[in-house]
Amino acid sequence: MRRFFYTHSRGVTEVVVGRGIPYDKYVERPVVLIEEGLENPLPNAPALALKGGEGVKSLEALSKVYVFLQEAEADRGSTLVAVGGGALLDLATFAAGTYMRGIGLVQVPTTLLAMVDAALGGKGAVDWGLVKNLVGVFYQPKAILCDLEWLRSLPPRVYRSAFAEVVKYGLALDEEFYSWLRQSTTALLNRGEDALEEAVYRSLKLKASVVEADEFEERGIRQVLNVGHTVGHALERVLGLLHGEAVSLGIAAELRLSAELGYLREKYVEETKSLLKAFELPTEAGLSSEQLAAAKGLIKYDKKRRRDYVYLPLVIRPGKWILERLRVEEVARAVEYVVPQGRTA
């Protein structure tokens, strides 16, 4: 069992990574929001089960959570315990941060992607129309409990997809971690306990350091967490991919853009694509002309856009990055880099 703490505007969050975590130790007056099909780790607490997946990040689902909290007589001394994947954790963060202007929140991520991404950061959101995370809040949890036991039964494709986010942390923030990942792909794909704990712990430590430095995205530092996500989010919507698969494509495209702009050496583009492929993640995708146009069109709705420009985090070498102001059309063209040899289907 490994743990650390990070500080923020609401105080301190405890992060625990290990197996067999005693959940009741970390919550007071719990009410549970849980993904359908999962076993409630706090069976004596009131619970609402919702279907997981991106569809849960809706105003309709948010309304159901508010009704549940009201019927459970939750107040500002209650703790909403969110048990599930990243989409459900996003919804829970939004609900906890807005119900009665804020109640307690504990995150229990049950997928690898949720552990290394959605659980930490304090972002809660719902989708609006075709745009991901358009309506949201910043609201930090009291604790994040990453029990690796949840990952034993995770479907292989879902499990593998999370490594796009893990690679992102090493690629953009920590060259030594990036090198460790290149040496540890087999152990991680085999769900080796020690390697998995190390990957989750180090990913969270890196993300926490960024959140501490720029909790509300006011200084530009937190933009590094969006490496691969500008192109990735557009492709996720158009192709219906898992989030991690789309981020993998986004990383490949944005690295190519960085190289074309003269920031990144070609060897790192190919080296990182090889690492993503080692985790059985895509770096190319066939798109029809209509899909390509749709993906490009979605770039203009990206939250990093300011008028005619997108502020894009670009990796310049493993562990180093810059924030570059690029025209929307220039970033949109980067979508083409994931199409094999620039051809559309």
Swiss-Prot record:
UniProt keywords, alphabetically: Amino-acid biosynthesis, Aromatic amino acid biosynthesis, Cobalt, Cytoplasm, Lyase, Metal-binding, NAD, Nucleotide-binding, Zinc
Cellular localisation: Cytoplasm
Record-linked InterPro entries: Dehydroquinate_synthase, DHQ_synth_AroB, DHQ_synth_fam, DHQS/DOIS_N, DHQS_C
SUPFAM superfamilies, A to Z: Dehydroquinate synthase-like (SSF56796)
Cofactor(s) demanded: NAD(+); Co(2+); Zn(2+)
This protein's pathway: Metabolic intermediate biosynthesis; chorismate biosynthesis; chorismate from D-erythrose 4-phosphate and phosphoenolpyruvate: step 2/7
Catalytic activities: 7-phospho-2-dehydro-3-deoxy-D-arabino-heptonate = 3-dehydroquinate + phosphate
Protein name: 3-dehydroquinate synthase
Organism per entry: Pyrobaculum aerophilum (strain ATCC 51768 / DSM 7523 / JCM 9630 / CIP 104966 / NBRC 100827 / IM2)
